[in-house]
Amino acid sequence: MRGTKAERSERISLMEDGILIAPAPYSAPAAYYFPSVARMSAVEVLKGSSQVQYGPFTTGGAINMLSTPIPTHFTGKFNASYGSFDTAKGHIMIGDRRGIFGYMVEYLRHQSKGFRRDEPDERIGFKRNDVVAKFGISTDHFSGVNHNVELKLGWANEDSDETYLGLSSEDFALRPYFRYAGADKDHLKTQHFQSVLSHILMAENGLKITSNLYYNYFFRNWYKLSDVRVGYLKEEKRSIGQVLADPETNHEYFEILTGQRDYIGEALMVRANRRKYFSRGIQSKAEHKWRLGESYLTVEGGIRYHEDGEDRFQEDDGYSMQSGEMKLFRPGDPGSQSNQVTTARAWSGYILNTWAWNNLTITAGLRYEDVVLEKRNYTKQDPRRSGRIRIETPNSARVWLPGVGVNYKIIPEVSVFTGVHRGFAPPSAVLDQKPESSTNVEAGLRIAISGLHFEVIGFNNNYQNMLGSDLTAAGGQGTMDQFNVGAALVRGVEALLSCDPMPHHWLVRVNTQLSYTYTDTKMKNDFTSSAWGDVHAGDEIPYIFKHSFNGQLGVTSKWVDLNVGVRFNGDMRTVPGQGPMALRETIPHHTIWDATIRAKVYNGVTLTLNAINLANKAYVVSRHPSGMRAGHPRGIYGGVEVKF
């Protein structure tokens, strides 16, 4: 997404069917959850001034995933695939509409043994399940109005052996897909439940009103290695990030972590990161289009009341390292590491007007966000939460967020556009912390000639106050509290070229698409944080590629489709800095090739073959949270799709 830090989905509005789907988008936006894309029918990506429709994050963009709709007639589909690393995926859907009633039920299963291996070649994979059901009733223009009521229910879980523990530079060069013995107990379990009751009213005069009542619940317990000890004093403890950042200096800790040295006692501290999240709310929007002489005016407005929260109840268990195996030495007391609840209540609303006259289109909108946050820290001394000891930290933000965009067709094939809007992200529950605010400007050119589409956009995100986050995943302490970065600048260029040079009457199509993004970042003031250390004016923001390129070549015929893709990412900083990048603070550039073949063997039956990382290149994707981590090695996956 445009001009935002790569910290999970923390700086984008993540939605499913127009509903905020992150576990707690206001109080804990960086939580680990993302809907399964394999069950989606489409994905909408919105950037620029149109973001006033969506919030609370209005700088980097919005992603709206559209789930499988209730079909208009009896429909079913089944697809399954299997391939490298015992990776298997199965998806089945069935639905129908009879008269005013309709339904859709689907199930998705995805599992793999994973491509990372430890010494005994034990568990390192994942298993995921996803179930969604929809039930709908539609009337047929009762008194000039059509009503559609739909109930959506969803359940998902994950059981995986993922870890924060990466590799040292030396070990990555020798065996990039290896796992250390200290990650043996790392395990993640999640449960997700969603429910949405929707009502759509469509009048004969074109008025459309959509209302949603929603509730989401998410539980996760990520049991993972956090620290290494060689004694009980504070200075005798190191985080795994500190150990792998300098394994030579911390050689004693590193040898325990890797199983090369035995230690009887609390040598390896494994944290039960137990958290519960909820989000609930009600929202409604109305839209209508009028003809005004030779022009058209479309007005859309909406309002939402939302509540969400995060409940942390965590402890550390101490393990010994004996003969390369972890042995439980002392279990921790529940709630002794973190014992707090953070909640948020938010009112938001917007109005968006689009006026179109001849070749000119003007879009202007205004959004309002009013959020109240509170953190209740019951402390480690009150695990029962009696309230005898409690630290309460409130915060709030109220903002108006305007945006305007202009599009003009010079000729039918060529148009220019520009836009400006106010960017916003809510603060965390830290006393007197400011929200993120920015002024975002874009301007571009689009050319669409038969078989050819070209687009170039320049953007400038000028932050009056950027927020950083104290995430373990980003090298911080893991409090998830945000901190004020201050003024910053993110600017760049996005370019897209797609073409199909084949004559229209040809049965074979050749589609080519090339995209390139250049991003330049700069922080404008000095500050110090636990996540980034000492930062100076002029430093670049970490984990944002300066150069990124993607290319696709597709050949399509009646029976066979072939697609070859290439993606290139340039060198990227992992910590703030300027000038030449230090090797230990760099993600080296890499180029990855992928390919897909689809063959229709019968009406409704398609065979698929998918290859990831054809050259089997071992490349680094991150140096955080703790050590170097490799991207997907070469993987070959075959499958079948059946529609009926």
Where are these regions (language model features)?
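Short acidic/polar hinge/loop motifs at secondary-structure boundaries
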Residues: 19-47
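Gram-negative outer-membrane beta-barrel transporters
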Residues: 292-293, 356-359, 460, 481-577, ...
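C-terminal beta-signal and adjacent terminal beta-strands/loops
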Residues: 464, 502, 509-512, 567-577, ...
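Transmembrane beta-barrel wall of Gram-negative outer-membrane proteins
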Residues: 75, 82-111, 119-163, 187-203, ...
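Face-selective signature of the C-terminal outer-membrane beta-barrel domain
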Residues: 142-150, 189-380
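Membrane-embedded beta-barrel scaffold of Gram-negative outer-membrane proteins
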Residues: 208-226, 409, 415-419, 435-502, ...
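Extracytoplasmic beta-strand/coil segments of soluble accessory domains associated
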Residues: 1-23
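Structural signature of Gram-negative outer-membrane beta-barrels, strongest in the C-terminal barrel
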Residues: 277, 294-308, 333, 337-463, ...
